[in-house]
Amino acid sequence: SKFKLPITFGYTLTDTEFINEFSSSDGAWGTIEKGDEIPYISKHQFNASIALEHAKFELILGARFNGEFRTVAGQGSIPNEFSVPNNTVVDFGSKYKYNKHFSLTGNINNLFDTTYLVSRVPAGLRPGMPFSASIGIAAQF
């Protein structure tokens, strides 16, 4: 009956910019200047998790952070009407190992039912995934 307590952290820094200027009739791009940030890419992303593992079961609590990003190309601070604000979402997962071939799984996404935005295109603001739960059977041979 040995327990493990793994902890993980991850960070991603994504610094984007267009290296050429161009114009597009597509509404998603418009006129691009050299040095404009590419839309819909968060500069900062972070995730962390802590788990409790045993020979028969696993429990994991994880959190993920996505930084603010712009929805149109541009430089400097992001105007509110072209911004999707940062968000943090917490998830929970579990697994019970029935035998060496079968496990029962359970997952809760967005444990605290956080309301957050993920997009503005097309047709306005779009929410992220609300609270959801699932159960399943995993087979391994």
Give the positions of each predicted feature.
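Gram-negative outer-membrane beta-barrel transporters
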Residues: 1-73
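Residues that define the transmembrane beta-barrel architecture of outer-membrane proteins
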Residues: 3, 42-46, 86-90, 129-133
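Residue-level marker for the onset of beta-strands and adjacent loop->beta junctions
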Residues: 19, 46-47, 90-92, 102
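Extracellular loop and loop/strand-boundary signature of outer-membrane beta-barrel proteins
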Residues: 28-37, 76-81, 120-125
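C-terminal beta-signal and adjacent terminal beta-strands/loops
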Residues: 65-74, 95-141
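Short, glycine/charged-rich beta-strand-loop motifs at protein surfaces that mediate ligand recognition
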Residues: 77-84, 91-95, 102
